Every structure is written in C-alpha cells, then in structure tokens.
Amino acid sequence: MYFFRALLSPVVLWPALVSGKSNSNTANYTVEELWDLEVTFWDNFLYPANVKQVEAINSTLFTTEVQGRVDITRVFNGSELNTEYIFGLFSDPNHLSLVGVPIAYSITQFIAERNIASATTVVTFNATSFGNLLLPVTIDTWIMWDANGRIMQYDATFRWFGFLLDTLVEALATSINGTASQATAALTQLLATTVCDTHDKYCTGENQQYDNSTACYDFLTTAIPLGKDYELGRDTLLCREVHEHMVQYDPKMHCPHIGPTGGDYCVNDQTYEQKVLQKYFNVSWIVGVPWTGNIWLGD
C-alpha cells in the first residue's frame, strides 16, 4: 500500500549524461514526452485500469529488471513483483484494505530531464473498507524510463502517511462510536482475520505457515505489533496486510510474507542507518554533473 518521495536535487538539470552507472537503454526524451509517460503511468494506476495491468502478470509499463523502492515498505525487483504490488495492491474494492482503490489523481509538481521525471501526485483513494471514505494521498516519485518508454527505476514516498493512518483510525472510531484505542483494537482484529482467511484459502500444502486459524490469529494479534507508519516493511501486522493482497497471485512467494517468519519482507533486518544508506539502484538519479559519489548506487 504502501507507494513515492521526490525531493528535488539542488543541482541544475542539464541535458548531459546520467552520472554513475550507465545503461544501454538510456533515452533522451523531451519534457513533453516525459509528461506523457508520467500521465500514462498514473492513468494505469487508477481502478479499474490497474486490474488489466495485474491480469497481464508482467506489466509492459515496466522493464523486465525494473527496480523500485517505496519508503514505507521495501525495495521491489522485477516486472512481475512490481506489477503485483504497484497495481494489484489497490485493485479490489470488495476486499478489506487500508486505503481502498485509487479513483482520481492530480499531478501538482513536475520537473523532468533526459529520461527522468520527479513529480508529486495527489491520488484520491476510495477507502471502501471505511465507509467509502475519500482520501487524498500525496505520493512523491522519481521515475526513470528506458528507450522503449518502460519504467526501469522508481523511488517513491507516501507523504504524511502517519497522518493518514491516524485519519483512518479516527474514521473507524466514529463508525463504531468508540475511542481511538478501541478502533485500533478493532482494526487489528479485522486485519488479522483477513490475513488468516487468505492464508487458509491459498497457503496450503508446502505453503502452509500456521497450524490452524487460531494459531494464525493469536500470532498476528499478540506476538507482533500492528505497526507504525514506517513499518510496512518490518515484522508487523501492517506489513502482512500489504502482502496478504499478493498471496493470491503467487502463494509460493507470498505465503511466507504473511507467516510467522515474515519471509524476506516482513522482518526487522535493517536499522535506521542501514535503511537510509542502502545501496540499491543500478543507475544514478543525478543528471548533468560529473558527480560519482552517489551512495545509493549498488555495488
């Protein structure tokens, strides 16, 4: 659910080179062409267009080896995984979900050069699980495209996500005529029940993670925390809520993510410093200056 922070670099965006590691598919688009590519992505992010992207399994909007990072969750590699998370996570209005489905957007900030665009987009979500509450969600993005107009890298931040979670809890508290604490407890129960139902349906045989539904529910409600706004990629219930949506697409891959171990995604394997300094991207986001000291570039 989790989605895009774009803090613009203070360097001048000159049409020179993309510093750091080179890429044979590096393109040189006009600003208008990059705007069109940006709009194409967001058009397909909305429901129900995102359903068609999910059904494609490997969205043609991504390169095969696309790299993606979302601040509140983790990094995502490859077109299939990114198709499941970027489009599949928000594609079912009838399934319990924190923010529901995206129904409209407005790009409020945009700057672009060569094959990179940095933008801020306010996406309106219909939180169908919270009485069709309409929520404006601010998503900051850096996106890089290859010569074929496919996304090869993206870096995303959900701005004010903690405020968003508090707003959802307040809405739930109002609906149950209770306190914020009671609403948080109710949300925990709802999410745990949904995760366990999904586990029982899809995580069978070698993919089974819990002995039974009771063991699943007890673990999710007592052994791990619900999670804070930055913990949708840590050992929390909120992280498992994110991955629960993906289980139906690939049980073998995603069942461990909702299980007790958390798989490779819902685990506390990073300190704050390690999160910030993680070397990940293959191509530098710095454009037009001979700077080779980008600490985010992978080895």
UniProtKB/Swiss-Prot annotation:
MF GO annotations: acyltransferase activity
EC top class, as a word: transferase
Organism superkingdom: Eukaryota
Glycosylation sites: N28, N58, N77, N126, N177, N212, N282
GO biological process, one term: terpenoid biosynthetic process
Signal peptide bounds: 1-20
Keyword Secreted on entry: no
UniProt keyword list: Acyltransferase, Glycoprotein, Signal, Transferase
Protein's pathway: Secondary metabolite biosynthesis; terpenoid biosynthesis
EC number in record: 2.3.1.-
Family in the record: Belongs to the bfoA family.
Function: Acetyltransferase; part of the gene cluster that mediates the biosynthesis of an ophiobolin family sesterterpenoid.
Protein name per Swiss-Prot or TrEMBL: Ophiobolin family sesterterpenoid biosynthesis cluster acetyltransferase
